[in-house]
Amino acid sequence: MSLQEDIITQLGVKPKIDAQEEIRKSIDFLKAYMKKHGFLKSYVLGISGGQDSSLAGRLAQLAIEELRHETGDNGYKFIAIRLPYGVQADEDDAQRALNFIQPDVSLAINIKPAVDGEVAALAEAGVQVSDFNKGNIKARQRMISQYAVAGENGGAVIGTDHAAENITGFFTKFGDGGADILPLYRLNKRQGKQLLAELGADKALYEKIPTADLEENKPGIADEVALGVTYNDIDDYLEGKQVSPAAQKIIENWWNKTEHKRHLPISIFDDFWK
């Protein structure tokens, strides 16, 4: 088995999908997990205004609505959280996403005071935080906020990780990579677009250039620029298609370099890293 075939198998990516079938699969998955755990009453997700949180958010809201209808329990709810660092440049997109998702509850938490306070505390201790590292602090602070809200609402935190993100390790460890449940896992980037189109989302939500937008020295830097490879190449690779040798090398280098992100903390019994 080639490395490409092994990766595809591990991530469960199909070369072609039926959008309606995958929507139903994700909704049923979210419902089943909540019903299995009687202490859960809510799902929580941070909404950025990008493709992934728009899709995961809408799927979560639909799952919760079906749960309420099927069980007669109106205590189930979906909580969407805006988590800007100060004023978000693409706030209009975030509001467009919320309008599409129609969450039961919508909160806004400005993470800037917490992030800046942490950076200042580190500086007092003699640790100067780089812009890149500060970006990771932002991602982790967002997850702290989501888990705090979940903890007060009998909630589980939804993650937006999908195959195109997983293969490259393009997420912050214990930041946006920290979550309880991943309804998009198995889908690549273009397949996520298919689901959003099927759900009737505004094209602006899935045609905008993807960006993590964590670094202040590189505001709005496109994912594809940061990765050095296009999502089209990543998606083709995940669908078992041939890509250029250069693209294949970059993708497989990301996979190997970020393997630690796809594991729980390493114990003495783990050997994947050797």
From Swiss-Prot:
GO cellular component: cytoplasm
Signal peptide residues on this chain, from the entry's feature table: none
Binding positions for Mg(2+) per the UniProt entry: 52, 165
Binding site for ATP: 46-53, 160, 189, 211
Molecular function per GO: ATP binding; glutaminase activity; metal ion binding; NAD+ synthase (glutamine-hydrolyzing) activity; NAD+ synthase activity
InterPro entries assigned: NAD/GMP_synthase (IPR022310), NAD_synthase (IPR003694), NH(3)-dep_NAD(+)_synth (IPR022926), Rossmann-like_a/b/a_fold (IPR014729)
Keywords: ATP-binding, Ligase, Magnesium, Metal-binding, NAD, Nucleotide-binding
GO biological process, one term: NAD biosynthetic process
E.C. designation(s): 6.3.1.5
General function of this protein: Catalyzes the ATP-dependent amidation of deamido-NAD to form NAD. Uses ammonia as a nitrogen source.
Subunit structure: Homodimer.
NCBIfam families assigned to the protein according to its UniProt record, in alphabetical order: nadE, PRK00768.1
Name the UniProt record assigns to this protein: NH(3)-dependent NAD(+) synthetase
Organism, as annotated: Streptococcus mutans serotype c (strain ATCC 700610 / UA159)
Lineage, uppermost ranks: Bacteria, Bacillati, Bacillota, Bacilli, Lactobacillales
